[in-house]
Amino acid sequence: MSDSPAGSNPRTPESSGSGSGGGGKRPAVPAAVSLLPPADPLRQANRLPIRVLKMLSAHTGHLLHPEYLQPLSSTPVSPIELDAKKSPLALLAQTCSQIGKPDPPPSSKLNSVAAAANGLGAEKDPGRSAPGAASAAAALKQLGDSPAEDKSSFKPYSKGSGGGDSRKDSGSSSVSSTSSSSSSSPGDKAGFRVPSAACPPFPPHGAPVSASSSSSSPGGSRGGSPHHSDCKNGGGVGGGELDKKDQEPKPSPEPAAVSRGGGGEPGAHGGAESGASGRKSEPPSALVGAGHVAPVSPYKPGHSVFPLPPSSIGYHGSIVGAYAGYPSQFVPGLDPSKSGLVGGQLSGGLGLPPGKPPSSSPLTGASPPSFLQGLCRDPYCLGGYHGASHLGGSSCSTCSAHDPAGPSLKAGGYPLVYPGHPLQPAALSSSAAQAALPGHPLYTYGFMLQNEPLPHSCNWVAASGPCDKRFATSEELLSHLRTHTALPGAEKLLAAYPGASGLGSAAAAAAAAASCHLHLPPPAAPGSPGSLSLRNPHTLGLSRYHPYGKSHLSTAGGLAVPSLPTAGPYYSPYALYGQRLASASALGYQ
């Protein structure tokens, strides 16, 4: 750099000329320029590096060079202005930015319509383009300002930019200029209406509005407006644009504003427009009657396009029981749609078919920690939420580490071992497994409904699939579970657990397994804190295999026994499920 930076002292004309002129190729800068301060824009523009950089970076800021697209106009237009309006990239950006927006005000739309009529009318329909442009210009004067930027805005869904502009515009212009002549020719209107098959110009559902009443009306421009708004609602966006073009040349802006507000919503404009024109005598609900296509627009509140049930409807067991993140095509033996107590009864309670695939839930593929924060991360859990009794230390029957992953895997972040009171001896008997599901204040799901004929279903999952047998009482379910749990090595397995020596029979093992596995609440009153948790976590949950668990049988007993010294009989039922543990770890359950 031969010249000094901007903050230096002023230079003489000779040094300035030699520094910025590149060795005398240019004449020296005049003294008036050189006497300016160095930070002045005139002197900065004469510096050699800035001039070279301007030359080199003249077109690097543009993705498309405009001179390759079209010849430059005679007036000196900077490439930035030229590129900002005309390049395909800019048009695409304009189009994308206008997709979800409401329609522009009537003046700007009429401006674009007039531009389209001037441009395309001579090619298509020379005889009719002149009155169209003239009346559109007159309507522009009526409605006030005319923003020039709207001419270049490309609206892909607006029929004003399509091929039939001249006919559409002349139709709307004749509506405004000659009061009743154009509305008395319904064939002309039907000609420029695009969804003519699904949207006839006159409503087919027995409305009292007839051709004679609308054509003989003195304000013919408003006489045809109910049919256009009908057609707009039936035909979606295209009919709506035509309706606005037909209504906007009128001096009274109320129907235009009303129809613009009700673009894709059936019945939103019915009441106000009946007050404005007095001829729209059909109810708004009849707008989507026979012969009309219901307006589907994802941007405006109308009929729902997506077949999702409302948010007040619960979903069946594929969410609550077995996490929609684990779809059944990967888990053929553990089908979430048949997830035992939850799957069968929740689907039955909600009126869903029992074998409905889990993909019917809108959460299929959702990650369980982010969306289903309150659900248990145990893949064998019935899907109840953690009750307040887990954290409050009340008398839940098996309050130990229900979630072996702990806060690292659960978004809820519960402590690893829940505090609990020492249990009463009665709670250790098999009556804990026989307690029927009470009417629960916290769980209003389908499997808690008391009017079900068979409210208890077996949730045993073997290698061949879930059992899913249903029983009327918990005693029958318990006796059925004894057939599952009567394994030859059950007593040896029980001997490994602290405090389990008192249970010397497989029946007691089945009782404990049923109490833990089915998560039945202890035999307390329905409103008591002990029954607040439908999902009572198993005591030695840390002892089962878990890919992220840091402690297994040895440390698990040490963790659970101090908090629950008498809870030994409530061993982990997963020690009996050898084939399930192998399949669960192979399937990547967390």
Curated annotation (Swiss-Prot):
<comment type="similarity">
    <text>Belongs to the Elbow/Noc family.</text>
</comment>
<feature type="zinc finger region" description="C2H2-type">
    <location>
        <begin position="456"/>
        <end position="484"/>
    </location>
</feature>
<feature type="modified residue" description="Phosphoserine">
    <location>
        <position position="252"/>
    </location>
</feature>
<keyword id="KW-0539">Nucleus</keyword>
<dbReference type="InterPro" id="IPR051520">
    <property type="entry name" value="Elbow/Noc_ZnFinger"/>
</dbReference>
<keyword id="KW-0804">Transcription</keyword>
<keyword id="KW-0479">Metal-binding</keyword>
<feature type="region of interest" description="Disordered">
    <location>
        <begin position="1"/>
        <end position="43"/>
    </location>
</feature>
<keyword id="KW-0597">Phosphoprotein</keyword>
<dbReference type="GO" id="GO:0017015">
    <property type="term" value="P:regulation of transforming growth factor beta receptor signaling pathway"/>
</dbReference>
<dbReference type="InterPro" id="IPR013087">
    <property type="entry name" value="Znf_C2H2_type"/>
</dbReference>
<feature type="compositionally biased region" description="Low complexity">
    <location>
        <begin position="27"/>
        <end position="37"/>
    </location>
</feature>
<dbReference type="GO" id="GO:0045892">
    <property type="term" value="P:negative regulation of DNA-templated transcription"/>
</dbReference>
<feature type="modified residue" description="N-acetylserine">
    <location>
        <position position="2"/>
    </location>
</feature>
<feature type="modified residue" description="Omega-N-methylarginine">
    <location>
        <position position="580"/>
    </location>
</feature>
<dbReference type="Pfam" id="PF12402">
    <property type="entry name" value="nlz1"/>
</dbReference>
<dbReference type="GO" id="GO:0016363">
    <property type="term" value="C:nuclear matrix"/>
</dbReference>
<keyword id="KW-0007">Acetylation</keyword>
<protein>
    <recommendedName>
        <fullName>Zinc finger protein 703</fullName>
    </recommendedName>
</protein>
<dbReference type="GO" id="GO:0030335">
    <property type="term" value="P:positive regulation of cell migration"/>
</dbReference>
<dbReference type="GO" id="GO:0010718">
    <property type="term" value="P:positive regulation of epithelial to mesenchymal transition"/>
</dbReference>
<feature type="compositionally biased region" description="Gly residues">
    <location>
        <begin position="260"/>
        <end position="273"/>
    </location>
</feature>
<dbReference type="GO" id="GO:0034111">
    <property type="term" value="P:negative regulation of homotypic cell-cell adhesion"/>
</dbReference>
<dbReference type="GO" id="GO:0006355">
    <property type="term" value="P:regulation of DNA-templated transcription"/>
</dbReference>
<feature type="compositionally biased region" description="Low complexity">
    <location>
        <begin position="171"/>
        <end position="189"/>
    </location>
</feature>
<comment type="function">
    <text>Transcriptional corepressor which does not bind directly to DNA and may regulate transcription through recruitment of histone deacetylases to gene promoters. Regulates cell adhesion, migration and proliferation. May be required for segmental gene expression during hindbrain development.</text>
</comment>
<keyword id="KW-0488">Methylation</keyword>
<feature type="compositionally biased region" description="Gly residues">
    <location>
        <begin position="341"/>
        <end position="352"/>
    </location>
</feature>
<dbReference type="GO" id="GO:0060644">
    <property type="term" value="P:mammary gland epithelial cell differentiation"/>
</dbReference>
<dbReference type="GO" id="GO:0008284">
    <property type="term" value="P:positive regulation of cell population proliferation"/>
</dbReference>
<keyword id="KW-0805">Transcription regulation</keyword>
<comment type="subunit">
    <text>Interacts with TLE4; increases transcriptional repression. Interacts with DCAF7 and PHB2. May interact with HSPD1.</text>
</comment>
<dbReference type="GO" id="GO:0005634">
    <property type="term" value="C:nucleus"/>
</dbReference>
<dbReference type="GO" id="GO:0033601">
    <property type="term" value="P:positive regulation of mammary gland epithelial cell proliferation"/>
</dbReference>
<dbReference type="GO" id="GO:0071392">
    <property type="term" value="P:cellular response to estradiol stimulus"/>
</dbReference>
<dbReference type="GO" id="GO:0008270">
    <property type="term" value="F:zinc ion binding"/>
</dbReference>
<dbReference type="InterPro" id="IPR022129">
    <property type="entry name" value="Tscrpt_rep_NocA-like"/>
</dbReference>
<feature type="region of interest" description="Disordered">
    <location>
        <begin position="341"/>
        <end position="366"/>
    </location>
</feature>
<dbReference type="GO" id="GO:0060828">
    <property type="term" value="P:regulation of canonical Wnt signaling pathway"/>
</dbReference>
<feature type="compositionally biased region" description="Low complexity">
    <location>
        <begin position="128"/>
        <end position="139"/>
    </location>
</feature>
<feature type="region of interest" description="Disordered">
    <location>
        <begin position="96"/>
        <end position="293"/>
    </location>
</feature>
<feature type="compositionally biased region" description="Low complexity">
    <location>
        <begin position="207"/>
        <end position="219"/>
    </location>
</feature>
